[in-house]
């Protein structure tokens, strides 16, 4: 078959290309040809002709083989990648093979590229990578992975990093594609299949989180596979590339790129490699986008997988991470389908942590978006999902063991199991709480109750909370469920925990069960449900826990029942008044009969135990039911408020309406249940019957049974009383048998009950036996008879009683009364019984008179403080007409005024009402306890006689000046109108009574004041309409007129009885903190234009703190107030002027600092103002003006009250109402903060805090406030806050608060505050110094005086600035500012740094500069010069900490400075260091600045390194150790290699040295000299000759001129140079001569101190090049110096000797040599000489020509001198040195023949041995001498005998093991 010309042509081209590649005979040619022919060759793979393609494949096979054998050959990678992306083909050609093979070869070529070349390819590879598809995209991605595998990340936050991001040029699509694939790559796990090289790649596996397609992309499509190690390498590279490369500059929150980065980091943070920790840390840099839809959806998709594309869920550890994020996201709760799958996966997981997080997620969803847990909102596939969740949780609990957790092998760790089970219970509660349907059938409630009862104690609180969360559902349960719930609660509450006392956990579980049951009872059933209330009563059993009892009583008290139910009503909006119970409504009680029926039924049931134990409370509640049923819907004193219990207890005593209503109700009761109930009460009261058998079922004693029985018997019908006849024997038996043991109260109750029943059965045998009274009967029998007979008389039932019996009774009583051994109080109470009911009328007048006389004689002297005697006396007065002196009764009672007991005085008041009104007294009428008795019968028998007389006597007492009489009269007057007020004789004198009470209001005694206030209330009630009107007007007048002190005797004048000078309080009684209020004038001054609150509000309102309530008797008067029944509000509505004056003042006084005043005022306000909020709104402006005025009042109470009131006012009203007066309000608020009174300041602080919050809300543009309005508010307020009333105020509290307010505004309203940023930054910076505590400033200034380092204090001050909230605020201001503000901000920072005075403000300025550089690096560049100049200027500040702060700022500024600026200020720093006036501090600051530049602007430092490095090198040798350390640190960090760096910058170093080594500052000269020495160690001979010469020239020139302290360092430098460059010196005669001359000159100087220092250096110099002249000169100078040493001390000692007497000399002489020997000076001199001699020995040893024998002789002579002179006293140092010098001299030669040398050595030995050969010489010296001797023996035989003999002598004198060993070593 013929081939076409195109095909042939193409094939020819392929063959040519293949030939050209094949004939390349070297790798270089092969590489060149590849660059040219390989890409075109690959294009032919797209040929339509198969033969051409086959030819290409064949060529490629050969090519690849050859390429593999030539690893050095580079492939045209860039061209291949470009071709793979856009092959140069016709549109119809298939480019697949071209692309794939281009990428295959490109991938091979990448392995051969350098790191730099690889990096250059990155932009090409990533550009448009998102547009590639399929295999091409996979291979390109793999190429990218290979490129970044060894990529070196730039430094964090550096310019290089920013440049790299721009270099990549990655568009948004590319970024998204790469981030998506990088994220997926971290989910990849290696295939478990072992890959063999010939085997094709597998594409058949998935990973958690990756589908088949996803895995294939990384493996099959890319043509690669990974093992674990390779995978980890690539992951590490990807992480570096993403976090420090392509995504490094992402800072915009919620941007798409940021979201993709966070998705990536989430996945990486759970990776199995150690990258997880790095990712977790990196994530912390950014806010988690919890509410970003894309991010949350991505996580949810990862968690649940995708069935559509076959992607499974991710691993459990990543699921846990995802759930921990979803648990904080609101958006995550919005997708029902996702929630369904998430919960299902989590709850079915075997991983404990995942299950726990799932439970938390369910709770999270339930809390925020419960409907999405609801089946209705889920997809059809997840029907009944909510039910599934709770069922699943319940099943899990069952599986773990239920009702008690069972621990088994499958159970996780105990703590883990406990926590998870707790969470399951809590989750269950959360779901049930929000789903009524689940609760309505009670199955879950039963389940939880059973769990609570039986599960482990650790779960108790969780189960209990879950149950309690359901109470909101209970009230709406269907009726059937409620019945079921009742049975459940009955079962729970009737459990007897005492049967399980041995098991404490079980008891606690039962208690928890009961507590929840009581809560359920109160929530589920209405108050009128008798069974529910019985459950409450069961809860009050005394063996229950306190909280159960408390909760049970709340269910029995209607007020708390309402409050409780209001608070649990979650389904509806509840009024605050309902929550507080302040809106009083009437709650219906269970019907009395129904409750009795339920109670009796329970007592008859098998489970009666619990009812019996709580019987006392059941009876108490039954009484409350009875009263409440009777008065339901009626106005009485029984208001259902928090004091309802007290009210209902006292109601039958004090409220006639209650009595009549109860009477009506009880009269109609006579059924069997009622009789059974009364019998029960009697049985419980008597406990045993007449046969002695136990009939009580309540296990304890309680007086309630007798009390309730007696109460009921007061109202029952005669028919009922007759049915109760059977009770009499048991009651009578109780009195007779237990007379001595029963309490007085029980005896009275029992006898009264018998008396009442007897009235209905007068003809019964029981009554006849009781009334048959004989003289000889017992006291018990008399006791009962005294109660029965008078009541029979009242009912006119005495016809069955023998006349003698009554007389016998009276005689028995008088007999007992006169008998000394009887209980007089009891007998008197019996006398009361027989007298008060008129029984004495049954006997003759004479017998009556005799009886009265006997009793009166017995008690009239005992009337003071004996209440029973007083009562008896009043009852005797009923028969006063039978006596001659009837006035005696009132006289004796009036005499009791001396008593100080309030209750007793009230008793006297009651008695006076009886004496005056007889049976017209309400007090006596209330004593009748017989049902249906007509009191008028008794009133006719005992008419009122002397009401007016006694009232006049009381008036007289009221007008008395005697305090005790006044108090008694006040109380008696109160009693009088209470009990006799209904009589015309009393009501006609209302004006007089009113006047007396008004006067009592001003009394000092609070009890009198309260009594008077209550008296006024009673007068108001009984007075006529005229009196009421005048009283109300007088009261209003007292409120609103300041002339309240004007004297008036009118009854209408509120202050008529009080003058301005009337003393109300003893000094000190009413202490205000600023002195005591003592006169009425003081009181009037407390308020502006308002009468005195202490007299009006406090006493006109009977608050519960009233003194009356503290008295047992007085409490009867503590009802209501004068305002309570008035219609003042109508009057206020009619009289607007009065209202405008009264309401603002009334409002203010509600907040009076005195609690009594404020409480009373609140009572009056609540009474006058029914609609409080409406009234406040109506009179808002008047109230506001009053309060602002009051805040400036001179009285602290007014100021404090006004401030508290205004605080309340502005919180309750919209801001628009007071916005116009905001500045005035702020001014007054700040004024109160600076008040002289601490309590006013405290309230002022609270007020300003609230103002600040209101201000923040009103300007918050982020919350929708109009920006224009916000700016308008701030334009007014901000100048105020930073003006003289705010930040610049004299008061510290005000300053601090203004500052706090501004900080809060910046924090919470950044948008609104933005335009004011520059001004605020300036103010805040300058404020730092003002707010610093003065004590710190003082301490810093006077640190030296307290021995404290000022720098330490300054460091703390600096730290205080950095950590200050104020500085954080500045930072926030800068972060929120715009580029356009930059110039203004920089100008204010410069201004602040120049104008600030204190350290904190200056430091703050420097820190602000740093923040600006960090935040606005690009925008800062134009201003860097100005700021650098400021920094340099601040180096001149006197405070080192300030200098350092600006030095650090300079480092940051270099980062944004142009090169010319950097060079300019670098040179200025160098100049500053070398200034002649430069101090250590200046040098330290320069060093800190350089260090800062190095750390924060590395690239800029490198640009000016040639300026800095010479200085750093030189400064490393500074004299100051701290500076030396600082600069050495900088040098180490800045130089890559020490010696190399020195060589690099040597010319610059030499230039700096040349300029500064001759500085006028000698310390700089020293530093330079030491630097030359250091240079010698850091360089070698290889440096250029001119530089060596320059070094010598620098040193020589520096030595010119006089000697100075430290000049020796330059000599040392010159010597070091000579040693280092000895050959150069030797080759240059001129140089050598010049050095010789300089050295000779320096050694010849006259300053011996200087010459002493340089002489050893001169010896070192000679050692380099010994010459005869220089050696001779050295010997001469050295000998001269050694002779001078010690001369000064000798002279001084000589002078001492001359002036001391002989005795002193003799005393100190033995110690003189020892003292001198060990002196520091002697040791220094000795060591100096030894050092000089040793250097001289080195000269001898280094002499290359003739041996300098003269120098040797000098050395030996000087050793001898050291041993024998008296100026330098030798020590072991010289002894040791002599031997060491000998060893050095002799040891140099192998053989010695010179006679002179041998002679000198012998002389040295002879000098050394005698000194060292004694017992005192230390061992080391002797050992060294033996070594010296051994060397002589070895090298000088002629001296051997002498030496050996000496050494043997040494051994004999002092032989030690070490000496013997050393001798043995040398052959001895």
Curated annotation (Swiss-Prot):
Gene Ontology BP, a term: ERAD pathway
Annotated InterPro entries: ARM-like, ARM-type_fold, Ecm29_N, HEAT_ECM29
Modified residues (N-acetylserine): 2
Keywords annotated in UniProt: Acetylation, Cytoplasm, Nucleus, Phosphoprotein, Proteasome, Repeat
HEAT repeat intervals: 32-69, 116-153, 256-292, 313-351, 384-422, 439-476, 590-627, 707-745, 748-780, 781-818, 846-885, 945-982, 988-1025, 1030-1067, 1137-1174, 1178-1215, 1272-1311, 1361-1398, 1422-1459, 1503-1540, 1544-1581, 1649-1687, 1746-1785, 1830-1867
Cellular component GO terms, alphabetical: cytoplasm; nucleus; proteasome complex
Signal sequence bounds: none
GO molecular function, one term: molecular adaptor activity
Residues annotated with Phosphoserine modification: 1692
Gene3D superfamilies for this protein: Leucine-rich Repeat Variant
Compartments, record wording: Cytoplasm; Nucleus
Subunit structure: Component of the proteasome. ECM29 binds to both proteasome 19S and 20S particles.
Job description of the protein: Stabilizes the proteasome holoenzyme, probably by tethering the 20S proteolytic core particle and the 19S regulatory particle. The proteasome is a multicatalytic proteinase complex which is characterized by its ability to cleave peptides with Arg, Phe, Tyr, Leu, and Glu adjacent to the leaving group at neutral or slightly basic pH. The proteasome has an ATP-dependent proteolytic activity.
Family assignment from sequence similarity: Belongs to the ECM29 family.
Further details from the record: Present with 2950 molecules/cell in log phase SD medium.
Identification of the protein by name: Proteasome component ECM29
Gene that this sequence comes from: ECM29
